[in-house]
Structure formats: structure tokens, C-alpha cells
Amino acid sequence: MADFNQILTTGDVDGGIINVVNEIPAGSNHKIEWNRKLAAFQLDRVEPAIFAKPTNYGFIPQTLDEDGDELDVLLVTEQPLATGVFLEARVIGVMKFVDDGEVDDKIVCVPADDRNNGNAYKTLADLPQQLIKQIEFHFNHYKDLKKAGTTKVESWGDAEEAKKVIKESIERWNKQA
């Protein structure tokens, strides 16, 4: 398998277009993670079916969030994307998130070229409010059966705030490289 951190860049962050590697298809309860040391995808665990991911879930190559992993992405598409698919995506916002006391923000994005929706999603406000509620509920509760109260969606930010989070994660990546 190719090492996505070697073959892909982060993309054009200032232009709002980033490279994304998908780990978990929307609707899956399999917690699949990119293992950076092995340059391979690994099944970390199987979550309860009620906590299937409401969106595709992936990462931005050559970034590190404060939790030590690549910066996470919530990728909104109409159909699930397979594990290992990579694409250019347009940044529309950020979900500010804390997991067990650690910052674990999620960049919200859509495919950069979505001809089915006419590229209708340009901001978080363009997304269906029910989807935002589902995402927030999922991340506030997906660990409740194991350790209740350890996750919290703190706030939502716009694309400019998301770009700032991405740039900070690029700096962390560059420091460890």
C-alpha cells in the first residue's frame, strides 16, 4: 500500500481545497484507522451499530492534530466512499471537538467537484440542519457505552477557522518530520 503521507500533499489550504484520504465509509461502524508506521489501514475496533459514522471519515496527509494523529476530516457525500479513496475536497468548516480531554478537531468538507449537487455546499449553513444534528449527536455520544461523558462537540467554525486549524496541524507535522 502507498504511504499517503509520502505521495500526497495537504493541498491548497489557502484556496480552500485539500487532499483527503478516506478511512471510514459513511454508515460504517468499523473504526478503521490509518497506521502511519505500517502505511496501512487497520481495523481498530467495531463500534455498536447505533454509532455508525454519519459521514465519511478520513484525514489530511502531512498534518498532525493535537492528539498526535493526522487531522481528521468529515467528508459529506451522498454515497459512502471506500476506505483508501483519496480526493480533493473543499473546506466548509470545522467541528471543534474534545475527546477524553484532548483536542481532536474535525475539518468538514465536501468533494471539490460535485456535479450531482451542483457544488451547492459552500458553508456549514448550506448543509441540512438534520445532518449537523446527527454529526453532533454521534460525536457527543459514540463513547457513552464504554465511558460516558468523555467526548464533547464544543462549537462549529467557518472555513477560515478550519484553514487556521489545518495550518497549525501542518506546522506540527513539519516539526516532527
From Swiss-Prot:
UniProt binding sites for substrate: 31, 45, 57, 142
PROSITE patterns reported in the protein's UniProt record: PPASE
Gene Ontology MF: a single term: inorganic diphosphate phosphatase activity
Cofactor(s) needed for function: Mg(2+)
Main localization of the protein described in the UniProt heading: cytoplasm
Keywords for the protein's UniProt record, in alphabetical order: Cytoplasm, Hydrolase, Magnesium, Metal-binding
EC numbers: 3.6.1.1
Binding sites annotated in the UniProt record for Mg(2+) 1: 67, 72, 104
Catalytic function, reaction form: diphosphate + H2O = 2 phosphate + H(+)
CDD domains per UniProt: pyrophosphatase
InterPro entries named among the record's database cross-references: Pyrophosphatase, Pyrophosphatase_sf
GO cellular component: cytoplasm
One example of a Gene Ontology biological process annotation: phosphate-containing compound metabolic process
Subcellular location: Cytoplasm
Residue sites binding Mg(2+) 2 per the record: 72
Function: Catalyzes the hydrolysis of inorganic pyrophosphate (PPi) forming two phosphate ions.
Family to which the UniProt record says this protein belongs: Belongs to the PPase family.
Subunit structure as annotated in this protein's UniProt entry: Homohexamer.
Protein name (database record): Inorganic pyrophosphatase
UniProt organism field: Neisseria meningitidis serogroup A / serotype 4A (strain DSM 15465 / Z2491)
Gene: ppa
